[in-house]
């Protein structure tokens, strides 16, 4: 939010052409553009690129069209082998997993690069398929001697902190793997394609935007695919997976540069299990599947469905916030300006957090915790001993099975404990919050706490206790429709939970039952 940050983003904005239609090509046997060991993307890997480009089109008003590899394109994709023979001499290089540039970028080619004279410089995305195994460790002072007498053109080096150099010798195993198997979503290579596409669309590495200490937390793949860092375990746990989409900060930056695609998934969509998004990064088929994704959605009444998982989860529907899903932590986020209305928890002890809009929050099995926030919300606890805070708005709270606690101090609400010995509280400690509630205790021995306002109460089956908070000078008007003598009881208490001795009261107009 500093002026320097704004200036940095402005420089990016000026360096990128805003385009409605972008074209790309998979490099074929055309004159070599970057690496002398360049190869075309294998056909089954082209499907991976197409899926990633569809995701980019989902968040940005850009349409990508595939064209002939013999034509100029705004984006070009290819593989390269980092182990190269430069001008017939031995060359030992440092390690890079991928390389990318955006269409307007200028720069001096590095030693390995051979420019293609017959094509305009496009945005390029090259992924390294060289693989290596440990060969030996030498002192840094001996590198020239090693290159002269022993080096192989397939060697690569890593500089260590102790003034030594680790030499790895290349093999062809990774190329064979890429040729035989499709890049899996959530793999490092899949993430690398997204990272390099980010560069081609104009993004720097995330740390280049960070100008003060408090923002350094953003330098991790929790927030951005443009980071090289995995998050600290206290901040997130992806279970060894990598981002499957552009992440929270990436989407914010890209939409600042290009604008937002406000036509993406305007219908009612489900993310997770039973997904109808048509995107692998948002779809789960069984409990073994995991996601590391940021959700962008333009409209409709949408749902996060994580109902089949048996682990404890945190589902947060607020934009810019993270959820802990499927045994991972902070692995699902919701992009800014995205509204997701509904959430379905799983079989564990889940926490469901609503947003300012009208939410349907379904807990499922387990002892679940609900926070509604603003909006007129519907809560369904499911089996287990649940705690539901309705908060602002006119809400409907249903505990279902289990010994539940239903709490809602604001608005005109409907609260139903369902089965079990439930506690229902609509009495705030603040005397200035009169309620207008319809309350059903349901089966079981329930405790119902009532305060100021108008309440229509049905205790239901069981031995129920109706606790009335009394405030000096404040009237309340509550009706109990099924009070049973010798079974139910009424208790009058002060705001600090001290029981009032009704025998010392000056006047009692009417009191039903024995107590």
Predicted regions and their residues:
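Surface-exposed loop/turn motifs in large extracellular/passenger domains
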Residues: 331-334, 431-438
């Amino acid at each position: 939010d500093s002026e320097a940050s704004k200036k940095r983003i402005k420089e990016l904005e000026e360096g990128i052409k805003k385009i409605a239609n972008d074209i790309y090509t998979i490099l074929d046997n055309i004159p070599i553009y970057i690496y002398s060991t360049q190869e075309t993307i294998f056909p089954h890997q082209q499907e991976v690129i197409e899926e990633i480009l569809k995701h980019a089109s989902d968040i940005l008003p850009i349409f990508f069209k595939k064209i002939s590899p013999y034509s100029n394109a705004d984006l070009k994709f290819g593989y390269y082998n980092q182990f190269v023979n430069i001008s017939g001499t031995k060359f030992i290089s440092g390690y890079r997993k991928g390389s990318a540039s955006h269409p307007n970028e200028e720069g001096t080619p590095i030693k390995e690069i051979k420019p293609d004279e017959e094509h305009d410089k496009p945005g390029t995305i090259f992924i390294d398929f060289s693989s290596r195994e440990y060969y030996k460790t030498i002192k840094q002072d001996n590198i020239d001697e090693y290159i002269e007498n022993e080096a192989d053109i397939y060697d690569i080096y890593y500089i260590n902190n102790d003034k030594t150099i680790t030499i790895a010798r290349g093999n062809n195993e990774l190329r064979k793997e890429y040729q035989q198997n499709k890049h899996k979503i959530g793999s490092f290579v899949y993430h690398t394609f997204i990272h390099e596409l980010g560069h081609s669309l104009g993004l720097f590495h995330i740390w280049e935007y960070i100008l003060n200490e408090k923002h350094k937390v953003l330098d991790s793949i929790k927030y951005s695919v443009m980071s090289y860092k995995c998050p600290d375990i206290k901040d997130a746990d992806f279970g060894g997976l990598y981002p499957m989409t552009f992440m929270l900060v990436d989407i914010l930056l890209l939409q600042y540069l290009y604008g937002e695609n406000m036509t993406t998934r305007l219908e009612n969509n489900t993310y997770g299990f039973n997904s109808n998004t048509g995107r692998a990064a948002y779809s789960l088929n069984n409990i073994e599947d995991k996601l590391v994704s940021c959700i962008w959605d333009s409209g409709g009444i949408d749902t996060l469905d994580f109902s089949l998982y048996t682990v404890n989860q945190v589902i947060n529907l607020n934009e810019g916030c993270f959820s802990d899903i499927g045994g991972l932590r902070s692995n699902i986020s919701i992009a800014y300006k995205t509204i997701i209305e509904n959430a379905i928890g799983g079989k564990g002890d889940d926490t469901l957090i609503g947003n300012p809009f009208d939410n349907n929050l379904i807990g499922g099995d387990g002892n679940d915790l609900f926070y509604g926030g603003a909006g007129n919300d519907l809560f369904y606890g499911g089996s287990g001993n649940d705690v539901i805070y309705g908060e602002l708005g006119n809400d409907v709270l249903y505990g279902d099975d289990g010994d539940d606690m239903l709490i809602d101090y604001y608005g005109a609400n409907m609260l139903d404990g369902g089965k079990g010995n439930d506690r229902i509280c609509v009495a705030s400690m603040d005397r200035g919050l009169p309620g207008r509630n319809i309350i059903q205790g349901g089966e079981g021995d329930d405790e119902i706490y009532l305060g100021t306002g108008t309440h229509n109460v049905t205790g239901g089956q069981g031995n129920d206790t109706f606790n009335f908070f009394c405030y000096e000078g404040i009237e309340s008007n509550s009706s109990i429709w099924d009070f049973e003598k010798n079974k139910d009881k009424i208790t009058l208490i002060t705001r600090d939970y001290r029981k009032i001795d009704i025998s010392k009261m000056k006047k009692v107009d009417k009191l039903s039952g024995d107590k």
